């Protein structure tokens, strides 16, 4: 026994990670290239086709003058800007290197060996990685019609449950849980179980019955909401995210995060991006127009499309072979979609809403694929 009373790991010929780490399948991002194709339309990572705000780009360029200086470890200017934008308490805001970092830190802080973390069967892959990294046990619950099922989550809760992750809207399905259901989940969970609401795509949702969950953070000691600057704000390369949490949770995160986990350029650029609401409004309008158009046009070709409230669509095919054939056909034209077999959806591809040019090319490409298939089948 060690001084702490725990059993030491068996000796080995080399340093060994704990068993949870060895059970992790490394995250594989969407493709970004197609060999032999001159022009690429990357529609695999849910990046905004409008790019970042011009004001954000100016702020990023200006930040080069301070590259030799450490950033403000508390990200005070950014937390203040976020609080002002959403009417929040800045003391409850914690910033991170993308919301991925915060999702992982929450597991590291609140989950340990022998304890369980819950997520849904087609939920974001990072949840499982975070749970295993913390030494916890991942518990996967079924969805209903590709949508988070509150009753299934509650049925999976045990005395060992410590954390529940839900993506709302969900990636890669694009479905969402109405606020009434999210509230029911928050109210029904034991008070010692942390509910993490991942609202990475929340800015795109225009449904009246949706909420990212800020209200629940204010009224529950066990609810955290995470957001990112990677999607609608167009700052994916800077790795910038934030969460709104109860004071005790924010305090715990601030104890374990890196002292300078948010870079100076990211802070400055994030502040400028928040201030340019006109750019965000344009991004929302563009998405509303083309999300609807893509769904209708692709549906006319006979492919099933899951209704989405985010900036992407889940396309369904006859089987995995057809999904792979469509993926290869479109890739040959420089149209890069996301295979989602790793999410348990081998018969599907995820399509990011792109520029007008890219969107029209995708539909034209699918039409040509259908024609080629008809010829082959005689």
UniProtKB/Swiss-Prot annotation:
The keyword Heme does not apply. Pathway: Amino-acid biosynthesis; L-histidine biosynthesis; L-histidine from 5-phospho-alpha-D-ribose 1-diphosphate: step 7/9. The modification N6-(pyridoxal phosphate)lysine is found at residue 231. Its cofactor is pyridoxal 5'-phosphate. The keyword Transferase applies. Pfam families: Aminotran_1_2 (PF00155). PANTHER family: HISTIDINOL-PHOSPHATE AMINOTRANSFERASE, HISTIDINOL-PHOSPHATE AMINOTRANSFERASE 2. HAMAP family: HisC_aminotrans_2. This is Histidinol-phosphate aminotransferase. It comes from Beijerinckia indica subsp. indica (strain ATCC 9039 / DSM 1715 / NCIMB 8712).
